[in-house]
């Protein structure tokens, strides 16, 4: 039921963006599993049903369901720690997601060619026995393909984690973190928020929000300064989070080259949208 309702809402947007029903189906799947959504996209791309441009654009649009997928695990931890500042942070990050989604769909509308459709996999499931059968076939296909994708991810997780651990032991991330945090804090927010940015940089955002709440309660930071510091921490956390968590998944599902390209393109747009939204908030907030 939820899948059909989400598909009904997504179809007009994906028609506008010239991305087609296959990419729309992957978008719907992303509300439940990002790995499964990427596996579906890559299968369509390998079999020539969608072009590379459709793959890249849909990968960015799928950041919208990813936002909601992870929201329940963070919202009820963050809000008690930071209260209004945390709520503003979530609002701004959501606006950033909407901004890049709108930009990508508009770009697709202007530049992308609609994929050729008409195969049996393109017909939406109906409220009939045949429709329910097609849904079960889709679920069976996901169950068949997902284990191989997960195995591919596992192959890359171990070496990447070892490499990250070695680089961390050598002090590379600490030096990079301190340098970037120092530059950003000195230019945009008070020095007192340095600890918030550094803790957020470590990709464990609960610590950053806890520090932010403590600084606000002590009167060191205002709500606005705390929100800006948390947004900066989100941006500065990209290198560590990408290496630790995202790169193994991307190169495991896609090829190493394609997975890296998708990761950099998607995260580049994410960071740009966060910077734009944060700058607007700094000016008018």
Q: Model regions: which residues?
A:
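Transmembrane helical segments that form the transport core of multi-pass membrane transport proteins
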Residues: 1-14, 143-220
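Short, membrane-interfacial amphipathic segments enriched in basic
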Residues: 2, 121-140
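Transmembrane alpha-helical segments of multi-pass membrane transport proteins and ion-pumping complexes
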Residues: 4, 34-38, 71, 97-105, ...
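Membrane-water interface at transmembrane helix exits
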Residues: 11, 42-45, 79, 108, ...
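Membrane-cytosol interface motif
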Residues: 13-23
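Membrane-interfacial helix-loop connectors
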Residues: 23, 29-61, 74-88, 177-254
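Alpha-helical membrane-protein architecture signal
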Residues: 24, 53, 57, 135-143
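Juxtamembrane and boundary regions of transmembrane helices in multi-pass small-molecule transporters
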Residues: 46-47, 80-129, 234-285
